[in-house]
Amino acid sequence: MATLQKILVVEDEPDIQAIVKLALELTGGYTVEVCATGYEAIERALMFAPDLILLDVMMPGLDGPATLHALRKIPQCSDTPIIFLTARVQPHDLERYRALGVRDVIAKPFNPMSLAQTLQTMWSTYDRATDA
């Protein structure tokens, strides 16, 4: 797997968008694209070809699970790691997310300044799993 460089953040809350974008750019040096809806995520994914997608679960319109399903139909996103951002982290929720094909889940609220390190740790785990 390549180096983690480009991250697509799909989040409907403007404050969370801004904080996540700033934190990932400053602490991780990543190129970050942000969008607010599942529909925008599909368009951006086609143009941006992200290495990783952070996807809010509860959004108006096309929610996280429906967006994930649509993204998986895009050839350049079929294997892209997708991490759900959500406050819903009960065991039954996590089982459902895994069944959908989500790589990981980050619980809200989270520390934005440690987000880049968390993602890098997750990415190295994906890299080892791919090499195995």
Language-model features: locations:
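Conserved acidic carboxylate
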Residues: 11
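Two-component/phosphorelay signaling modules centered on CheY-like receiver
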Residues: 14-33
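Acidic, metal-coordinating helix/loop segments flanking the phosphotransfer/catalytic sites
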Residues: 34-52, 69
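Receiver (REC) domain active-site loop signature in two-component systems and cognate sites
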Residues: 59
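Short, glycine/charged-rich "phosphate-handling" switch motifs in NTP-dependent
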Residues: 103
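C-terminal output helix
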Residues: 110-119
